[in-house]
């Protein structure tokens, strides 16, 4: 069974055999054949889309698996990190507590040392005074040898008195210790009484709050009841309530006053007892001190006490040195532990950052694939909806009549003048290709020539003294920017080199202004290279602009709407098929020579959009912006004017045919 296109071709052939064909009629026939060829290529395109959807499903599965692996690893690392951090905090807290304890002990030891040193100084003064008196006594002894017997008897008497005094001193010291103990007990009882007073005050406040709450509740209940009774009953209940509340207040105030009086009486009595005990103890201590001063005339006891104090002082100093050494060791141990924990935390952060970077790369790839698949689906749906085509392939048409189509179209200029230009579309796209072999990459190049941005993607600082940025704008002279001799780009940092005409502020090390150049330049081919101090190219980014112009025509004869693609400029002027649309790189390809149309289109049309691809030379992500200019009258739907009449869709592999008259070649 013949298709509608075959029937139209048969009818056209019969008419052509019976009547001579006009140039317009020949053009229509040739366009019908081209439309049939488009159907074949659309079928190939649909197969390609299906294969891409299959690949996308596999990639989605891989991305899902990668996300699950990354989430599990991040959760494990996070748990380990939190556990290690908790252990480090516990260790730090224990070290801080031990340090505080050692500092307290050190302060106590220092106070004891100061007290012992003062006592030692005082006893040394007493020793010197006693030695001077000993000399006087020896002189008296020499002058009073005659009264030796009397002195000996007095000596025995004095020795007895000394023994009695020592006993009294021991008793007084015991009494002093007991007085101190009583004073401490009194202070503890005082603190206890103050605590009880505070507790009673809090209980009083609590009782007040309870009574206030009960009062409010009682008022609320009475107010509820007063709604149902008359005014006389209401006044009676209010007076009763006021009397009851007044009695409650009086009772509570009496109890509070009684508690206060009892507490004050108890506190005053205990305070008076403590004061009396302190006074008695101070009197006893004064008497004891006087007796001790009298007893210090004995050199032997002073010497013994002095030697004992010196021994105690030496022991305290040794203990102090031991404590200082122990504190130093604890500090060193704490520093080592903290350094190890910080190093482990830095390693975990680095691993987490690496995994996040890998996940971000996978996510970027997924987003790019989703964008491309969405665009392909929209294009195919628009073509199928407008042309109502089935995916069944037809036989390929030879391209032998392409030249006749071109010549007859030119010869029938008088007929084509009847066509009205409905709409035209201009697409300007920027394709970027980057390559990096070192730590620093050219991250971004401004299309208007305002700035160039570099990024250090490594974990180490990069010295960039005397490095150069070389900018080549097509056939224009080479521009070279040289970094300062001591410039260093830190790890993960970004530096932007602004042209002086951009109006940026010089703020090293993140923003540098090239005062010698007003602009970095702009054009259809921009190549930016980073050269190190040895002259080696370590990074490069190339930006190429391509421009295509698409026109949408309408014929007024019996054949209706048909596709027509204009390949702007002189590209493939002699012969060739309509251009193919490469789905992967999103550039228009010549159907004859397979070269990008931007080389032939050059700078034709208006620049209104850009296509930006980032990453290495092996992959690119493209986003295209376009505008639409409408001329003439009439027009189709959005899908007819903007998408389906713009490009002839085919597979991603360009056709291989003769390229005799191709301007690209």
UniProtKB/Swiss-Prot annotation:
UniProt region (Head), positions on chain: 1-33
Prodomain positions: 648-662, 663-665
Site annotation Stutter: residues: 325
Name of a matching Pfam family: LTD
Region (Coil 1A): 34-70
Disruption phenotype: Mutant mice survive postnatally for 6-8 weeks and show skeletal and cardiac myopathy, sarcopenia, osteopenia, decreased bone formation, neuropathy, abnormal neuromuscular junctions, decreased skeletal muscle growth and decreased muscle satellite cell proliferation. They develop ventricular dilation and cardiac dysfunction. Within 2-3 weeks they show a reduction in their growth rate and by week 4 their growth ceases with their mean body weight being half of that of the wild-type or the heterozygous littermates.
Site (Cleavage): 647-648
Family: Belongs to the intermediate filament family.
SUBUNIT field: Homodimer of lamin A and lamin C. Lamin dimers then assemble into dimeric head-to-tail polymers. Ultimately, two head-to-tail polymers assemble laterally into a protofilament with a uniformly shaped rod of 3.5 nm in diameter. Interacts with lamin-associated polypeptides IA, IB and TMPO-alpha, RB1 and with emerin. Proteolytically processed isoform A interacts with NARF. Interacts with SREBF1, SREBF2, SUN1, SUN2 and TMEM43. Interacts with TMEM201. Prelamin-A/C interacts with EMD. Interacts with DMPK; may regulate nuclear envelope stability. Interacts with MLIP.
UniProt name for this protein: Prelamin-A/C
Lineage: Eukaryota, Metazoa, Chordata, Craniata, Vertebrata
